[in-house]
Design a protein with these regions (language model features):
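Glycine/alanine-rich phosphate-binding loops at beta-alpha junctions
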Residues: 1, 26, 30-76, 80
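Flexible, polar/low-complexity N-terminal or interdomain linker segments that lie immediately upstream
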Residues: 1-35, 63, 137-141, 146-150
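Catalytic cysteine-centered active loop of the rhodanese-like fold, especially the PTP/DSP P-loop
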Residues: 65-125
Length: 250
């Protein structure tokens, strides 16, 4: 079965259903990636650097040969790793995977060819992670109907937000996404904060998922900066203009 190259719109619509294989280098993935994507690097960070240098200094074909030399010895281990990823998912009989690299070029094409040869149904992202980032930024220009929970420090804003979530109300937990507990506790007891780019990725995907089934979103009143990440400017302006539900606790 031939590899299918799809748009970012199609790719995003399939992200909740099938495993996402990010074939960029480990450092690229560590900086920021799609939510729930698995890291399956075609090249190590050093190999990527060497191939890039060869491309600039010697040209395309010598760089491709070098890349193939790196790729060849990894083929079996990469297939084995994908088998483990598939087995870890809810449907072990699923043979569909989504693959992307930085710009939808040779890295994703190479891994997609291998997995297609092995019998998987493979979809690659046209434009790669770069197209995804454009999609992420576009989510912050959409008009949302926010219901903003405000109140003084200690009034229970976060607890109220989580109570709404427990009642199946649609919420966005900005502090949770940022791994930060607000002005009082900061990142005490939290995982390391994500990069700004990763924060945006997680936030965009949360907005997309909620608005697929709800026309409003509960959100906590925040300053624009949460730890060392910032709420995107256009989204923050929307929050400022949205209806505020102030918790006036005696």
């Amino acid at each position: 079965m031939a590899v299918k190259r799809i748009s970012i719109t199609e790719f995003v619509s399939m992200m909740e259903q099938y495993p996402i294989l990010d074939v960029r280098s480990p450092l690229e993935y560590a900086h920021a990636h799609m939510k729930n994507a698995y890291s399956l690097p075609l090249f190590s960070d050093e190999e990527r650097k060497v191939v890039g240098t060869a491309y600039k200094q010697q040209g395309k074909q010598p760089a491709i040969k070098l890349g193939l030399n790196y790729f060849g010895v990894k083929m079996v281990s990469m297939v084995t790793e994908v088998e483990a990823i598939i087995a870890a998912n809810s449907d072990p009989n699923n043979k569909v995977v989504l693959v992307h690299c930085w710009r939808g070029g040779m890295r994703s094409a190479g891994v997609a060819w291998l997995l297609d040869l092995y019998g998987y149904t493979v979809y690659t992202l046209a434009g790669g992670y770069k197209a995804y980032r454009n999609w992420v930024l576009a989510q912050f220009t959409i008009e949302y109907q926010f219901k903003v929970i405000g109140g003084y420090t200690g009034s229970g804003k976060t607890e109220t937000l989580h109570a709404l979530q427990a009642s199946n109300e649609p919420i966005i937990d900005l502090e949770g996404i940022a791994h930060h507990k607000g002005s009082t506790f900061g990142n005490l007891g939290q995982p390391v904060q994500p990069s700004q780019e990763q924060f945006e990725n997680l936030l965009a995907q949360s907005l997309y998922k909620i608005t697929a089934s709800h026309h409003y979103i509960w959100i906590e009143d925040e300053s624009r900066r949460i730890g060392h990440v910032n709420i995107p400017a256009q989204l923050f302006e929307q929050m400022r203009k949205s209806k505020l539900y102030f918790l006036d606790i005696p």
